[in-house]
């Protein structure tokens, strides 16, 4: 059975790329055609590359490899947190801090500080401090939770990194390249496939597209670690607290390409 069907990819809008004037010519091999000024991604290739990515992820998960999901744009943040949490991966969904991987020993001290503050809060130590001091500590705790909460259980740099929006997460990509960490990347038509070890040509702006692709990768991790998924294991309700509301606040019409994409979706229906 296929990992994902062409119908599922089509229904999720995975095929809609960016406006033709914003393309990266290196993506031409993954583009099927252009329609109304928007590039259309070849879903036959996407489906096959999803098969390859799924097997790669499942095999690595079976070997005990560790995964990091990275996606800080609003429409990806909540999905990143949800799917990474579901399969036991770490994630960064707010802002990539410079040196998060290449300067891990320093970042790790901040993670330890986060754990320390959480323990203090849970035990009531912060509440017993003077009001001003408690406020400062809680503010520090909140900031650390926001930026480092998704890597709190990460003991060393990951073995595989999943990237949503290659252009936005360029700093993360540079660090992965420097450390030789393989990357699975969703590649929209404005991306550069040279920076992806495992490419998945796909719309990286639409929530449904991101959800479908990341959901399948999370399934592969879960299956590699725990065995075949049961039907009840596939998905769980989205927890809004994981992304601080960014997931639901996204308005597709704010994106320059989305009005064209929306009109084309309407035509197909």
Swiss-Prot record:
Mention one GO molecular function: structural constituent of ribosome
Q: Where is the composition biased (Acidic residues)?
A: 230-269
Superkingdom as given in the UniProt entry:
Bacteria
Q: Which GO terms describe its cellular component?
A: cytosolic small ribosomal subunit
The protein's matches in SUPFAM superfamilies, at most eight in alphabetical order, are given as: Ribosomal protein S2
**Cystines in this chain:** none
Q: Where is this region: Disordered?
A: 228-269
Record keywords, A-Z: Ribonucleoprotein, Ribosomal protein
Please report a single Pfam family linked to this protein: Ribosomal_S2
* Biological process (GO), any one: translation
- Extract the PROSITE patterns matched here: RIBOSOMAL_S2_1 (PS00962), RIBOSOMAL_S2_2 (PS00963)
In terms of InterPro entries, this protein maps to: Ribosomal_uS2, Ribosomal_uS2_bac/mit/plastid, Ribosomal_uS2_CS, Ribosomal_uS2_flav_dom_sf
Q: Which NCBIfam families match?
A: rpsB_bact
PANTHER family referenced in this protein's UniProt entry, alphabetically:
30S RIBOSOMAL PROTEIN S2 PROKARYOTIC AND ORGANELLAR (PTHR12534), SMALL RIBOSOMAL SUBUNIT PROTEIN US2M (PTHR12534:SF0)
The text of the family note is: Belongs to the universal ribosomal protein uS2 family.
* UniProt name for this protein: Small ribosomal subunit protein uS2
- Source organism per entry reads Crocosphaera subtropica (strain ATCC 51142 / BH68) (Cyanothece sp. (strain ATCC 51142))
List the gene name. rpsB
